[in-house]
UniProtKB/Swiss-Prot annotation:
InterPro entries: BshB2, GlcNAc_PI_deacetylase-related, LmbE-like_dom_sf. One of its GO terms (molecular function) is hydrolase activity, acting on carbon-nitrogen (but not peptide) bonds, in linear amides. This is Probable N-acetyl-alpha-D-glucosaminyl L-malate deacetylase 2. It comes from Bacillus cereus (strain ATCC 14579 / DSM 31 / CCUG 7414 / JCM 2152 / NBRC 15305 / NCIMB 9373 / NCTC 2599 / NRRL B-3711). Pfam families: PIG-L (PF02585).
Length: 220
């Protein structure tokens, strides 16, 4: 069993989309999970399907949504790092890595889940993935936690190969949907479409709710 898992993503809802089922499987097994969330996603364009947020209220709404999503996934240790949404690419990578390294030293994880650098599509995703790698690279090789990274670029398999970690989350997909639903301001319309596709047994949607895949980060 894993000693401790550290999840590091820049935005509320990244964790639910990318690893919500995997996280729930871990917490159901009694594995301690810490989530370091970089921002409150305050620059997101979605304000709810039937608009209920504005630029002033969205940070507070998304903070509450994040806490509710963590509850659905069984996460009891949530760290909000306080960076500003859509600016992580402009932060000094060592400064961000310092924040992450401090948490690594505190919780001593055996595994870290984050975005694969340059395969996160969004600049914040790539910046946070780079910062995680920088933080872990400072550790002696024999002490480094394994990094299971999420890759969402279209050419990911051509560049990285097939994912070497594929988790069957079918027994907890309802918790993944609950976590996604907690991020209502961002996901309400998407989930209505998802539930319709589930009802119609859409193959791609059913696969998405059954499997989560990761690439073990390869050190140079």
């Amino acid at each position: 069993m894993e000693r401790h898992v550290l999840v590091v993503f820049p935005h509320p809802d990244d964790e639910a989309y990318a690893a919500g089922g995997t996280i729930r499987l871990l917490t159901d097994q009694g594995v301690p999970v810490t989530y370091a969330c970089g921002t409150l996603g305050q620059m997101g364009r979605n304000m709810g399907k039937n608009v209920f947020a504005n630029r002033e209220t969205i940070p507070h709404i998304r903070k509450k949504e994040l806490k509710d999503a963590c509850e659905a996934m069984g996460i009891k240790d949530l760290r909000m790092l306080g960076f500003h949404d859509k600016t992580l690419e402009f932060e000094d990578v060592d400064f961000v890595a310092d924040k992450i390294e401090a948490i690594i030293q505190e919780v001593n994880p055996s595994r870290i889940i984050t975005f694969y650098p340059e395969h996160g599509v969004h600049p914040d995703h790539n910046a946070f993935g780079r910062a995680v790698v920088r933080a872990v690279s400072r550790m002696p090789k024999e002490e480094r936690p394994v990094i299971h990274a999420v890759a969402i670029t279209k050419n990911r398999e051509a560049v990285l190969g097939e994912p070497d970690v594929v988790n069957n989350i079918s027994e907890v997909f309802d918790h993944k949907l609950t976590a996604l639903g907690a991020h209502r301001s961002q996901t309400e319309a998407m989930l209505e479409d998802t539930h319709a596709k589930i009802k119609n047994k859409d193959a791609a949607t059913l696969k998405w709710l059954q499997l989560e895949q990761f690439w073990t980060y390869k050190w140079e």
